[in-house]
UniProtKB/Swiss-Prot annotation:
PROSITE patterns: AA_TRNA_LIGASE_I. L-isoleucyl-5'-AMP binds at residue 552. Its main location: cytoplasm. It is found in: Cytoplasm. This is Isoleucine--tRNA ligase 1. Zn(2+) binds at residues 888, 891, 908, 911. Its EC number is 6.1.1.5. It comes from Bacillus thuringiensis subsp. konkukian (strain 97-27). ATP binds at residue 596. It catalyses: tRNA(Ile) + L-isoleucine + ATP = L-isoleucyl-tRNA(Ile) + AMP + diphosphate. GO terms for cellular component: cytosol. A motif ('KMSKS' region) lies at residues 593-597. Belongs to the class-I aminoacyl-tRNA synthetase family. IleS type 1 subfamily.
Length: 921
C-alpha cells in the first residue's frame, strides 16, 4: 500500500502565485460586468449614509504616487463603511479649469492668439476630458470602487451653474466686492494668484540700505536727519510714498561723522555693524508715535514720503523704518489707505515698469534693480548694497518669482464672516489634531480672497457693467446666467454679447441707452472646487451636506479645505464637512522629494504592471500616512513578502477545507478542544482590533495585526501543529473536524477583514470558500467578534502556555545546532517548569507532544530539580534528547510502536489504526 495516498494533504485550485498584474484586470472586468458599485449601493440601501467627499484631482497627466496614496486611503474607508452598517456612496471628481491646461495646449502648439476665446476654450475642454479619461482608467486599475460612470467634473454645465449660484449667494450677502488692492501677481502667468497657488523657493536678491532726507521735522526733528530704510526689492522704490514706524518703538537719532540718521534704538548695534559705522553716537531718542506726519523726501523723485504709524513694523530685520509702497504690499496698502495715500503701482501685467516710474520705464522689474541701485548711489542715498538668499514666493505652476501688485480685482470678503469660519473650524473633527490649529491660524490671519483671474479657461465672473461703470449682480441676472450655463455651458459667456446674456427686457438706471458690457475675468479655480459642496453634495440625491469626511494631502489646508470652508460658511453658515483627515507626501526611500532631476520618481503604473494593485494598496496600509511616507523598490519588496505570507495563509486554509462542508461538519463551540477555542479567542481579538483600527483610520494597525496573526498565531503555532491532525487522522476524526471548524471561521473572517485593503485578492479567495453564497465578498459585512464565555480564562492559561512554548522552541533550536537532533520530531523533551507553569501544564488535556511538535514529552520535577547541565529559561528548564524508537513512514513521529501491527510494519500504532479504519476495505 502507498501510505502517502492515505494522507489528507491540502487540495485547492486557489493559485499559489498571485500573478496580480494579469489577474487583477480580469477581476476588474468581472466587477464591471456585475456592476459591483451599483450592487453594493443596492445591498446597503436604507442604511445610514456615510459620505466621503472626493477632493477633485487636477485633470492633467498620469496619476502620481500622491494621487495613488490619496485614492487608496479613501477606498479603504468607503469599503470598510459599506461593510459595517452604512451606505457609503463614493462619487469621484475632477478639477478641470485653470492655467496648466492652457499651458499644455500651448506646449502642443495651439496658437492661442489666432482663435477666439470660445474656440480656445473648446480645445481646453476637449483636452480636460481626455485627461479625465486617462486618469479614470488609472484609478480603476488601483481597484478603487466608485461611481466611475457618473463622476463630477467642474467644467460640466450643471456644476458651473451651481458655482454661479454660490457666487450669487455670496454677492447677495455683501461678501463679494471689487477693489484696487495688492495681490500676488505672476508676471509669467500674467494673472493674480491665490495664496494656495504660491510656493516658496530660495531666491538671490539685492539687500540695500537707503537714506531718505527729512523735509519737514514737525518740531520733533531738526530737519537735517535722514531716515534709513532697508529693502530687498529696489524695483519698488519708484512706488514709494511713505515710511512706516512703530508707534511703541523708541527711535534713535544717530550721529555718524557729519550725518544724522534715524533708526530703531534696539537695532542700533546691528545697523552700525552692517553699515560699518565708527564713532557713531546716539544724540537723541524719540518715540515712534512722535514721528507721525513728519515728512521725508523721496531719494530720486521730487516728491514726499510721509512718515506713518504701523503695527506691522518689527525689529526682526532692517532698521525699524519701513519703506512703504501702497501699490506693492498688503501692509503698505492698509497703512497707506489709513493715511489717504494713492495706490501707485508703476508695473504692468507683464512685470514691466511703466511711465509712472520715470527713468526706468520699459524695464522688467527684476532687471530694474540694478539701474535703480545705481541711481541711488549717484544721488548719495545708497548706504549699503549686499546680496542675500532668502525664501521668496513663486508661482506654483511656472516656478518663477511673483510680485505684489495692486490691480482691480474681485474679492470675497473673509473679514465679513471670519468669526463664523473660526467657529466652523472648532466644530469639525480633525485628524491629525494639529489640523485644527493649522486651519484656524490660516483663517484667522488670511486677508480677503482674491477670486478673479485674468485668464481664458475658467468659469466667468457673472458680473455686468452699466454704462456708468456700475457693476450689476442681482438675483435676476445671477439666476439667468446660471440657467444659461446649465443649458449651454459657460462658453456661452464668450460666444454672446452682454445684452444677450441678460434677461429679456433687462433695464438698469446706470444704462439709459440699454448698453451693457460683461466682466472678462474668470474665477480662481479654488472657487470651482470649493463650490463642490453645493454642486455635488447638495445636488446629488445619493449624497448629503455636510459630508462626513474630506480626506486630502496636507497641502489642502490652504487649498481645498480652506476654499470649501469659505464658500460653505458664506452660503450655509456651516462647514461642508464633519471631519477632515489629512495625509503627508510621498518621498523616495531616502526621504527625498521626488523630482525628475534626481530621477527618483516612482510611478503607480509601473508598480501595478510589475507587482499589482494590491501590493501598492498593501504598501499604503503599511505606512504612517499622516506624516510624509517613503517608497522604494526595497520597501515594496518587503511589502510583497508580507503579501505572499497572507496569500499563502489563504491557500493553506483553503487547501485544508477542501473536504469540509460547513452545514454538515461544523463542530459546536462547546465541543471544541481548549486549544481550538483559544484560537477562536485569538480570532475574536483580531476582529475587534482590526475593526477598531479601521474605525480610527489607523490602517497600519490593520496591516500589522493581520500580518502578525498570519505569521505568529497561525503559521508558527496553530497551523504548524494542526498538520499532524489534518493530514494524518481520518477525514471525520473529531479533532480534525474541530480544527477545520476553527480554520473555516478564520478563513471567512480574514477574507472579510482584508477586503478594504486587498479587494482583488479577497474576491479571488471568496468563491473558493465552501458554502458561501454571495457573489462577492464586497456584498457581505465585517465579521462580528463572538465572545466565548471562558475567553479570559482561556487567554490567561494559553498565553502562559505560549510563553513556555517559546522556551521549549529555544531549547530545540540549541539542540539542533549542537546536532543532538535533526528536526523537532526527532526529539524527546523533559520539562522542569516553575510551579505556576507546572500546574498549567498538568491542567492541559491535549496531546502536549503534538503541540510542541516532538515525538516524546515528559514532565519532570520542578525547575530546581533539573539536571545541572539542562538549559534553563525563564519558565522552564528543558532536557532535549533523541526520541527512542523508529520513525513512522506515514506521520514521521519517532515511536516504539512501529511494526506492532504486523500488517503495517513501518507504521506506528496510531497510523496503523487510521489506515485500517479508513483505507483498508
Amino acid at each position: 500500500m502507498e501510505y502517502k495516498n492515505t494522507l489528507l494533504m491540502p487540495k485547492t485550485e486557489f493559485p499559489m502565485r498571485g500573478n496580480l498584474p494579469k489577474r487583477e484586470p480580469a477581476m476588474q472586468e468581472k466587477w464591471a460586468e456585475m456592476n459591483i458599485y451599483e450592487k453594493v449601493q443596492e445591498h446597503t440601501k436604507g442604511r445610514p449614509l456615510f459620505v466621503l467627499h472626493d477632493g477633485p484631482p487636477y485633470a492633467n497627466g498620469d496619476i502620481h504616487m500622491g494621487h495613488a496614496l490619496n485614492k487608496v486611503l479613501k477606498d479603504f474607508i468607503v469599503r470598510y463603511k459599506s461593510m459595517t452598517g452604512f451606505c457609503a456612496p463614493y462619487v469621484p471628481g475632477w478639477d478641470t479649469h485653470g492655467l496648466p491646461i492652457e499651458q499644455a495646449l500651448t506646449n502642443k502648439g495651439v496658437k492661442r492668439k489666432e482663435m477666439t476665446v470660445a474656440e480656445f476654450r473648446k480645445l481646453c475642454a476637449e483636452y480636460a476630458y481626455e485627461q479625465v479619461e486617462r486618469q479614470r482608467e488609472q484609478f480603476k486599475r488601483l481597484g478603487v470602487r466608485a461611481d466611475w460612470d457618473n463622476p463630477y467634473i467642474t467644467l460640466e454645465p450643471a456644476y458651473e451653474a451651481q458655482q454661479i449660484k454660490v457666487f450669487g449667494d455670496m454677492a447677495k450677502k455683501g461678501y463679494i466686492y471689487k477693489g484696487q488692492k495688492p495681490v500676488y501677481w505672476s508676471p509669467t502667468s500674467e494673472s493674480a494668484l491665490a495664496e494656495a497657488e504660491i510656493e516658496y523657493q530660495d531666491k538671490k536678491s539685492a539687500s540695500i540700505y537707503v537714506a531718505f532726507p527729512v523735509k519737514d521735522g514737525k518740531n520733533v526733528l531738526e530737519g537735517d536727519e535722514k531716515y534709513i530704510i532697508w529693502t530687498t526689492t529696489p524695483w519698488t522704490l519708484p512706488a514709494n510714498l511713505g515710511i512706516s514706524v512703530h508707534p511703541e518703538l523708541e527711535y534713535a537719532i544717530v550721529k555718524v561723522n557729519d550725518e544724522k540718521y534715524i533708526i530703531a534704538s534696539e537695532l542700533f548695534e546691528t545697523v552700525a555693524k552692517t553699515l560699518e559705522w565708527e564713532n557713531a553716537e546716539v544724540v537723541k531718542t524719540v518715540k515712534g508715535s512722535e514721528l507721525e506726519y513728519t515728512v521725508a523726501k523721496h531719494p530720486f523723485y521730487d516728491r514726499d514720503s510721509l512718515v506713518m504709524l504701523g503695527d506691522h513694523v518689527t525689529t526682526d530685520a532692517g532698521t525699524g523704518c519701513v519703506h512703504t509702497a501702497p501699490g506693492h504690499g498688503e501692509d503698505d496698502f492698509v497703512v497707506g489707505k489709513k493715511y489717504g495715500l494713492e495706490v501707485l503701482c508703476p508695473v504692468d501685467d507683464k512685470g514691466v515698469l511703466t511711465e509712472e516710474a520715470p527713468g526706468f520705464e520699459g524695464l522688467f522689474y527684476d532687471k530694474a534693480n540694478k539701474p535703480i541701485t545705481e541711481k541711488l548711489e549717484e544721488v548719495g542715498a545708497l548706504l549699503k548694497l549686499t546680496f542675500i538668499t532668502h525664501s521668496y514666493p513663486h508661482d506654483w505652476r511656472t516656478k518663477k518669482p511673483i510680485i505684489f501688485r495692486a490691480t482691480a480685482q474681485w474679492f470675497a470678503s473673509i473679514e465679513a464672516f471670519r468669526k463664523e469660519l473660526l467657529e466652523a473650524v472648532a466644530e469639525t473633527k480633525w485628524v491629525p489634531a494639529w489640523g485644527e490649529t493649522r486651519l484656524h491660524n490660516m483663517v484667522r490671519d488670511r486677508g480677503d480672497w482674491c477670486i478673479s483671474r485674468q485668464r481664458a479657461w475658467g468659469v466667468p465672473i457673472p458680473v455686468f457693467y452699466a454704462e456708468n461703470g456700475d457693476p450689476i449682480i442681482t438675483d435676476e441676472t445671477i439666476n439667468h446666467v446660471a440657467d444659461l450655463f446649465r443649458e449651454h455651458g459657460s462658453n456661452v459667456w464668450f460666444e454672446r454679447e452682454a445684452k444677450d446674456l441678460l434677461p429679456e427686457g433687462f433695464t438698469h438706471p446706470g444704462s439709459p441707452n440699454g448698453e451693457f458690457r460683461k466682466e472678462t475675468d474668470i474665477m480662481d479655480v479654488w472657487f470651482d472646487s470649493g463650490s463642490s459642496h453645493q454642486a455635488v453634495l447638495e445636488e446629488r440625491d445619493d449624497l448629503q451636506r455636510p459630508a462626513d469626511l474630506y480626506l486630502e494631502g496636507s497641502d489642502q489646508y490652504r487649498g481645498w479645505f480652506n476654499s470649501s470652508l469659505s464658500t460653505a460658511v458664506a452660503v450655509t453658515g456651516k462647514a461642508p464637512y464633519k471631519g477632515v483627515l489629512s495625509h503627508g507626501f510621498v518621498l523616495d526611500g531616502e526621504g527625498r522629494k521626488m523630482s525628475k532631476s534626481i530621477g527618483n520618481i516612482v510611478v503607480p503604473k509601473k508598480i501595478m504592471d510589475q507587482l499589482g494593485g494590491d501590493i501598492l494598496r498593501l504598501w499604503v496600509s503599511s505606512v504612517d500616512y499622516q506624516s510624509d511616507v517613503r517608497i522604494s523598490d526595497d520597501i515594496l519588496k518587503q511589502v510583497a513578502e508580507v503579501y505572499r505570507k497572507i496569500r499563502n495563509t489563504f491557500r493553506f486554509l483553503l487547501g485544508n477545507l477542501d473536504d469540509f462542508k460547513p452545514s454538515e461538519n461544523t463542530v459546536a463551540v462547546a465541543e471544541l478542544r481548549e486549544v481550538d477555542r483559544y484560537m477562536l479567542v485569538k480570532l475574536n481579538d483580531l476582529i475587534t482590533k482590526v475593526k477598531e483600527a479601521y474605525e480610527t483610520y489607523d490602517f497600519a494597525a490593520v496591516y500589522h495585526a493581520i500580518h502578525n496573526f498570519c505569521t505568529i498565531d497561525l503559521s508558527s503555532f496553530y497551523l504548524d501543529f494542526a498538520k499532524d491532525i489534518l493530514y494524518i487522522e481520518g477525514a471525520n476524526h473529531e479533532d480534525r473536524r474541530a480544527i477545520q471548524t476553527v480554520l473555516y471561521d478564520v478563513l471567512v473572517a480574514l477574507t472579510k477583514l482584508v477586503t478594504p485593503i486587498l479587494p482583488h485578492t479577497a474576491d479571488e479567495v471568496w468563491p473558493y470558500i465552501p458554502g458561501v453564497t454571495e457573489e462577492s465578498v464586497q456584498l457581505t459585512d465585517m465579521p462580528e467578534a463572538v465572545q466565548l464565555d471562558d475567553a479570559e480564562a482561556l487567554k490567561t492559561k494559553w498565553d502562559a502556555f505560549m510563553t513556555l512554548r517559546d522556551d521549549v522552541l529555544k531549547a530545540l533550536e540549541v539542540a539542533r545546532n549542537e546536532k543532538v537532533i535533526g528536526k523537532s520530531l526527532n526529539a524527546s523533551i523533559t520539562l522542569y517548569p516553575t510551579a505556576e507553569m507546572k500546574a498549567m501544564l498538568e491542567s492541559i488535556n491535549e496531546d502536549l507532544k503534538q503541540l510542541f511538535i516532538v515525538s516524546e514529552y515528559k514532565l519532570g520535577g520542578m525547575m530546581e530539580e533539573a539536571p545541572a547541565d539542562a538549559p534553563k529559561y525563564e519558565h522552564t528548564a528543558v532536557v532535549v534528547a533523541q526520541a527512542t524508537g523508529e520513525t513512522c513512514e506515514r506521520c514521521w513521529v519517532v515511536s516504539e510502536t512501529i511494526g506492532k501491527d504486523a500488517e503495517h510494519e513501518t507504521l506506528c500504532e496510531r497510523c496503523a489504526t487510521v489506515v485500517k479504519e479508513n483505507y483498508v476495505k
